[in-house]
Swiss-Prot record:
EC class (word): hydrolase
Keywords, sorted A to Z: Autocatalytic cleavage, Disulfide bond, DNA-binding, Host nucleus, Hydrolase, Late protein, Protease, Thiol protease, Virion
Other comments on record: All late proteins expressed from the major late promoter are produced by alternative splicing and alternative polyadenylation of the same gene giving rise to non-overlapping ORFs. A leader sequence is present in the N-terminus of all these mRNAs and is recognized by the viral shutoff protein to provide expression although conventional translation via ribosome scanning from the cap has been shut off in the host cell.
Lineage: Viruses, Varidnaviria, Bamfordvirae, Preplasmiviricota, Tectiliviricetes
Protein name, as recorded: Protease
Family matches, as Gene3D superfamilies: Adenoviral Proteinase, Chain A (3.40.395.10)
Enzyme Commission numbers on file: 3.4.22.39
Record localization: Virion; Host nucleus
Protein family per UniProt: Belongs to the peptidase C5 family.
Name of the gene: L3
Function summary: Cleaves viral precursor proteins (pTP, pIIIa, pVI, pVII, pVIII, and pX) inside newly assembled particles giving rise to mature virions. Protease complexed to its cofactor slides along the viral DNA to specifically locate and cleave the viral precursors. Mature virions have a weakened organization compared to the unmature virions, thereby facilitating subsequent uncoating. Without maturation, the particle lacks infectivity and is unable to uncoat. Late in adenovirus infection, in the cytoplasm, may participate in the cytoskeleton destruction. Cleaves host cell cytoskeletal keratins K7 and K18.
Active site: 55, 72, 123
Site features described as Cleavage, chain residue numbers: 52-53
Organism: Human adenovirus D serotype 17 (HAdV-17)
């Protein structure tokens, strides 16, 4: 197994205090945030459930500022998300805007830097970490808060550069330490989770094929 299962992510997110605001892990068919007056968040896979999943993203809705946050651990642009994963979220945003805003307008803020290594399978865990930041600091979840300040972002264009691999490896180590402090579920299943989400997991899978 590689990556994180829906059950694992839901258990970790509950441990992180996101339960009341959290939609269960879902797929690219996520309808959007339809209860517009409430803080809400979700972890969404770029593929359908029948595929086994490909890549996890996190979304957060802050009704006070009418802002939708989209967190991608790789920091890909909209164009790259569509190119690599065939993932588009414009329809979800439109449904959220119609349901959540009297004037049908909202702001979108998305991550633009890379915090995850190119061969890492920890995207779902990074999303859990972001949602902890979102729930506790909903007006500044991307950075400038104690949770996300543990990570160091690098320009997305350097994702494949050997120069940034030590930084991205440290990010994954910080991620595991953070979850070990805050999630009993992670502590109980740490060995299996770290094996499935290893920093070089995708490289391991390519070699074994």
């Amino acid at each position: 197994m590689s990556g994180s299962s829906e059950r694992e992510l839901a258990s970790i997110v509950r441990d992180l205090g996101c339960g009341p605001t959290f939609w269960a892990p879902t797929t690219q068919r996520f309808p959007g945030f339809l209860a517009g007056d409430k803080l809400a968040c979700a972890i969404v896979n770029t593929a359908g459930r029948e595929t086994g999943g490909v890549h996890w993203l996190a979304f957060g809705w802050n009704p006070r500022s009418r802002t939708c946050y989209m967190f991608d651990p790789f920091g890909f642009s909209d164009r790259r998300l569509k190119q690599i994963y065939s993932f588009e979220y414009e329809a979800m945003l439109r449904r959220s805007a119609v349901a959540s805003s009297p004037d049908r307008c909202l702001s979108l803020e998305q991550s633009t830097q890379t915090v995850q290594g190119p061969d890492s399978a920890a995207c779902g865990l990074f999303c859990c970490m972001f949602l902890h930041a979102f729930v506790h600091w909903p007006d500044r979840p991307m950075d400038g808060n104690p949770t996300m300040n543990l990570l160091t972002g690098v320009p997305n264009g350097m994702l494949q550069s050997p120069q940034v691999l030590p930084t991205l490896r440290r990010n994954q180590e910080e991620l595991y330490r953070f979850l070990a402090r805050h999630s009993p579920y992670f502590r109980s299943h740490r060995a299996a989770i770290e094996h499935a989400t290893a920093f070089d997991k995708m490289k391991q899978l390519r070699v074994s094929q």
